[in-house]
């Protein structure tokens, strides 16, 4: 019985045994030009790469989630312009929602040492700020690929709900993202 199954479906069996093809090129093909910065090569690798994303760095959190202190949050075009200027996307696909907070990186890092709270999706891996903070919620209204993403800017004042990630090198939790700005009373 088993022998007849193997003989009848030999091609399917061989296809299952094949190794997946590795993509050629990527960001490394640009390294031969010599005058391209390492930061740009890292950006290309993140956008075009097929592996897992790199853990967050202080620079990345500042770029992605910390609001510009001199720019008013009530600006109607805040989200559309900031998302474009800061390159907030996932492999050039528009991000459906995003948050910018008016806090320092040190404050977010301090939040990572707070007790665990429920995230919006119900998992227990977020941290909730004890003080109200100002921020902006960006909601995608139009577009699906950069640079055609247009966002609605919604000002919020509430408690920040952030996610943190363990950093092995320093043996501490560091900020990873913003889950929500919760309006608690």
Question: What residue spans do the PLM features occupy?
Answer:
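N-terminal "domain-start" segment
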Residues: 2-127
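Ordered, helix-dominated protein-protein interaction surfaces in large eukaryotic regulatory proteins
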Residues: 3-4, 110, 140, 164-166
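Short, structured protein-protein interaction patches enriched in aromatics and acidic/basic residues
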Residues: 121-141
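Compact beta-sheet-dominated globular domain cores
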Residues: 141-185
